[in-house]
Amino acid sequence: SASGMWVGFENLEPTIQGNSETGHQQIGNNSLASQLPLEITNSIDSGSFFENSALNTVISNAKERSTKINFCFLLSGVRGNDGRVHSAWNHLEAFLELVFERYKLPVKQVQMQAILDGRDSGIHSSITKEQGSGDFLGRLQNLLGIYDANESLAWVIGRSTAMDRDYRESAAKTDFDLLTGKAMHTVSSFDEVREIISESHSNGRTDQDISPISLTRTDGTKPVLSKGDAFINLNFRSDRQRSKIGFLAGARSLLKSESESRGRTWDGSWIEHNLNLDICTIAEYHPDFETKYKVTVAFPTK
């Protein structure tokens, strides 16, 4: 069966569905080859995740320098059938434990970009329960609440903008503007985020197309990605992460070549931002990020 543990995924119910690629990876092997999500999960179970050199270096540097840790995560992947294509919920749980329990970072030093799915999970599953899953925003609120860290939710955005694989400059620029504090729809609570999402659903817009939302803290400050900050991407599938990491790392030449290969032309002047971010990705997205742009990878391709 080209699914679940037989193609190197976690043994979950419902079973995670594989494809021809994951099936072909097992041909000729004497033992099952683990897919990256399982490798990460195994590291969490063994405890080695919390000792991961790349993650710990970025987090400890931010703690020492008193710079912010910004991170993004696609809200999906609790079960085997509600996403888990780009992200896995237990990876988010482990990361928050690392940041808030192991490093005891203050909430004001952590800023999360929550990306809404609506494609690999239900189209309204950010706020709607579906077949034992869904309500990802509620799950996130409960999870952050464990650490009294609800104010670390800084930005909410649909995946069609924040995880665009077609190299649309307008999508990348919108995502960048959200992270850097440009004018966006601003609210101050989870409930207000729900109201905006619910209204969007009523108007025919699904989770993946939700417009950018910025959440202010109780003191009125607006979340901003600042020069010298850390940025960690917790999504493990590479194709929809390259554009974001490209513009954050200032990889203008890479984005130019990738967009041109798809018949698009970027202006790209806004990428000359000199943010000098300390970037770590959970998986390897493009070899140039490491060799040319000082991006570190927590779980490199083997």
Predicted regions and their residues:
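Active-site nucleophile/metal-coordination loop of metallo-enzymes that catalyze phosphate/sulfate
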Residues: 1-80, 84-160, 170, 261-302
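Hard-cation-handling environments
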Residues: 145-147, 154-156, 167-302
